[in-house]
């Protein structure tokens, strides 16, 4: 993978993906006929995805303000409560009218992307902003979070509108590929991982892809890029980076698998829902 979205030199490209995916999200929500359409997110309609985006975007702005002031943020909640807490946040905005909700999201989003655009190289790499669930993270993580949200949730809305076979744009999914390994690391279900000692491979085709070997042992997941997967107990092969991203977010069960069926089954049941 030649492109590293975490490097400052990738900033302009990453922010272009944010704007592109946000525009696609807005295209769906700006149609009033879509407001009450069910989405791929269980229990959420289009209006709730808008609520979710208000929740996280305003949350990022608040945390950025805390960091700029040099104040101490509340302790991270951890990932195991992420799904339930985000659900509460999204549904709390149902009291807003459609017009109020959309205006509030767009206002917050413009403020956040303006902050992203002004980040210096030192800030991109070293300015830490405390995430509600993850704790202190470097600034470059936050544009990626926006790509995850706008990219995957636009897919969720299109799924609800009838396009069940859609893929994320290759560039969008490609930018997210490195982050999927981090998500896997932090979402290992400790009960499912008990006694698991496996090594498996990930292969993603195309210019955004590569090969990685993953080891799971003692409830911990580690990974490294490799040239050879011949000693992996199983291999998950994704022909499009979208398949990897949507599988990570448990929207689909994508890719082709080869190797030990027991290992494949363990991997598929290794992660809790985020």
Which residue stretches match the model-derived regions?
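Acidic/His-leaning functional-site neighborhoods
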Residues: 204-233
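Short, contiguous alpha-helical
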Residues: 33-80, 129-189
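An N-terminal domain-cap segment
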Residues: 2-51
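Amphipathic, well-ordered alpha-helical segments in soluble domains
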Residues: 21-28, 56, 108-111, 115-118, ...
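C-terminal interaction segments
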Residues: 227-274
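Short, helix-capping/interhelical loops that line the mouth of catalytic, cofactor-
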Residues: 1-11, 60-118, 122-125
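A glycine-rich beta-turn/hairpin centered on an aromatic-Pro dipeptide
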Residues: 173-214
């Amino acid at each position: 993978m030649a492109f590293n979205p975490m490097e400052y030199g990738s900033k302009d490209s990453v922010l272009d993906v944010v704007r592109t995916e946000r525009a696609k999200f807005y295209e769906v929500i700006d149609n009033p006929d879509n407001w009450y359409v069910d989405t791929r997110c269980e229990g959420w309609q289009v209006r709730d995805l808008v609520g979710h985006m208000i929740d996280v975007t305003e949350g990022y702005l608040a945390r950025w303000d805390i960091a700029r002031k040099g104040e101490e943020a509340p302790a991270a909640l951890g990932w195991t409560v992420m799904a339930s807490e985000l659900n509460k946040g999204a549904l709390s905005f149902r009291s807003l009218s459609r017009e109020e909700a959309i205006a509030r999201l767009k206002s917050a989003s413009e403020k956040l992307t303006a902050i992203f655009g002004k980040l210096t190289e030192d800030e991109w790499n070293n300015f830490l902003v405390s995430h509600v669930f993850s704790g202190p993270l470097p600034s470059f993580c936050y544009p990626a979070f926006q790509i995850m949200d706008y990219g995957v949730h636009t897919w969720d809305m299109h799924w609800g509108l009838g396009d069940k076979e859609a893929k994320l744009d290759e560039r969008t999914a490609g930018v997210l590929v490195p982050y999927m390994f981090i998500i896997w690391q932090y979402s290992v279900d400790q009960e499912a991982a008990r006694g698991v000692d496996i090594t498996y491979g990930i292969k993603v085709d195309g210019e955004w892809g590569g090969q990685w070997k993953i080891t799971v042992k003692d409830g911990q997941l580690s990974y490294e890029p490799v040239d050879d997967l011949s000693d992996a107990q199983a291999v998950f092969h994704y022909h499009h980076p979208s398949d990897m991203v949507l599988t990570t977010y448990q929207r689909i069960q994508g890719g082709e698998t080869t190797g030990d069926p027991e290992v494949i089954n363990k991997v598929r049941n290794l992660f809790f829902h985020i």
